[in-house]
Amino acid sequence: MKRYICSIIICLVVLLSIGTYYVKVASSASGLPTYTIKTIEGSDKELDSVRVHAALEVGNFYEPLMIDSNRNTNIRGRSFWSDEFDYRIERLVSEHRSFMRGKDVIDSFYEDADFLAYASLNNEYTKSGKMNAEFDVALLDKKDEDETSFRIAVPDQGRFMNTEVWDVQLIHSKLQVLTMNDVDSNDDKQTKEVHLYTIDLAKKEVVSDRTLVSETFTYPDQVEFNIPVDISPSQPNNMILFSIIKGVTHEEGDYEEKPKDSKLLSYQYDTEKLTTIKGAKKESLNLDIARSGYTDGKNLYAIDGTSGKYHLKTFDLSSEALTNDMELDLAFNKRDENFVAIKNGRVYFLVGNRREKETLTNDPAQLLIADLKTGKTLYKGETVRHAADKKNDQKIGFYISNLEVK
């Protein structure tokens, strides 16, 4: 009987804690400022596809804030278990609700006119401490809405302590799944690998496991694998870029990169060719540009502010050459953080999160929309803060987390 009483008490404490959290959130939300976007130049219609994700910092609480296309503000208390869906996931859910159940990571999808494919990794650890990893695979034939789904074990799963899906492509009825794997080790050595798994959808099995890159290092040396931001992660792509960043952690705890030891690589799915991009020519694609770039599988777009002005540079991935360099009509400030989206033949450029001596200011965020080819400004605007409680307004921080475009 005592055991049941203890269980009941624990449940009541948990429910009371959750209830207290939501009461605090609800009471604080009523006094929070709201935000809209004020048009400075151009047509308001350019905002129809824009959504700005942000947060308000109120003491120890963070309130999600969404400034959507009609310039209204949506503030809501965040659930302990909620997921923030973006436009791309929302569209897939609305079009294929049954297939999308339980699937919410855009990097795990592939979509063309005929098929919607999905491949994710489920990682669990056994009692012995080894990882038990499975591919969760699904394919939807859009024509007849026929769904196929299955799970298969990751080859040599006992070697790995962590796996992450980078890219999914459907080529000749086989899924190509590119992953970054951390190898388990019993000594001081650490190993990171990039794997390409080929999954035969008809046989429901992994028919190939190719290690594209393997790097072994020992502390204080460090190695990181990175990929540029993919602005269209679910679309068919024949090429993917990734970088190997090497560095060292000094005794004082400071980290120093080793640019000469780091490199940029490209992998071509159709030719199965792995190439090191050297960037030897002036104004050609290189490691520094790719690390801060945005790619759509054909081009890489990078923001450059070294001249004291914002420039959007476009590089052709196949030739590695600079094909366009346009100046953006927005004042440059090195204390600003920038967010970029490339879509609809436009560049959407948002700057904000300005800091003064490491303190976040409440300065307005600036939004620019320009034609991707000509650089012509189509829209300029800025966020406007509407205080609900002027007495406490300056104590509330505003932080931008993402820029989304339909």
Located regions from the model:
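N-terminal "mature head" segments of proteins
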Residues: 1-147
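Surface-exposed loop and turn segments in beta-propeller and other repeat-based domains
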Residues: 72-100, 149-160, 208-227, 275-286, ...
